[in-house]
Amino acid sequence: MTEEQIIRLEHLTKVFRNNHTVTAVDDVSFDVRKGEIFGLLGPNGAGKSTLIRILTTLIAPTSGTAYVDQYEVTRDPESVRAIIGVCPQNSTLDVELTAYDNLDFYGQLLNVEEKVLEERIWELLKMTDLTDRATSRVSTFSGGMRRKLEIVRAFLHRPLILFLDEPTIGLDPDSRFEVWQQITKLNTEKTTIILTTHYMDEAERLCNRIAFMDKGRLIALDTPENHKRALPAGDLIDIGFDRIDDRVLPAIRESGLVTSIEEKEKSFRISAKNGNSVLPAIIGIFEKFSVPMTSISIHSPSIEDVFIYLTGRKLDSGEGEQPQPAGGGKAS
């Protein structure tokens, strides 16, 4: 690996066999750079969590290789575990213990020296704004508070790499924002963060680079901005109206100013390379046929638009999800 790389995957594949064969990860190769927040984005069943399980040494790949720092995950799993922290999708906090005791218990499992551990616990509680709730049972915490505590617990031993599997799933918008702030704080300590999510806004807000996965395959990898620049459609113009003249739509199409038009009920969504430059001409067409507009908005493509362009469907459509083998299936 190069000096700037901290994770490298080479043709990684994972196949589960039970009553049927499922290729959860299919010939995936990429690298992760030191200190970045790297996003794995895709629908349920895309292979994100399976990939994380391989990188954290919970399961072995069927074929291919994966390196975490300088360690190959199947040959030196103990060295890998010593330098990573993992926050799984499903909570593993003991809700009957206090916030402090949850961190203390985990630190003892990691054999952190007692004096160092106490200082570190208070440091992390302060980071999460939970100092005044240190002696409160976790059962009394909101979903956002629990998630923040679980994330910093994985960070207790100052790992080089932090794996966060769907860190905000099931949280309300305010709690999601709190967790986003927490993740950003952790990244300022130069920790590399691997984030799996199916929330487009989360990946776009947090990640330096985003890898799109679908049906076990890597379909695109770049920065959020470069992903959006690669779209042929350009800007999106939404125009609302109460009534329409049948001549408006053909006139816009024949103008040569736009790349596509999507008809909706009482609105058009128009794609153009430069929305601001073509908007006056489009408005002129509406005015020519005496059609009043009720709303006009221009916005740049989103990460969701990128996913739709790459796969032909929305992320939450559920199409293309891979069934997971019952009971985990037989790995090969």
Where are these regions (language model features)?
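Walker A (P-loop) phosphate-binding loop of ABC-type ATPase nucleotide-binding domains
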Residues: 43-47
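A short, flexible loop at the N-terminus of ABC-type nucleotide-binding domains that lies
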Residues: 2-6, 14-27, 77
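ABC transporter nucleotide-binding domain
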Residues: 181-273
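Conserved ABC ATPase "signature" region
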Residues: 104, 108, 115-133
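Conserved catalytic motifs of ABC-family nucleotide-binding domains
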Residues: 158
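Catalytic Walker B motif of ABC-type/P-loop ATPase nucleotide-binding domains
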Residues: 162-165
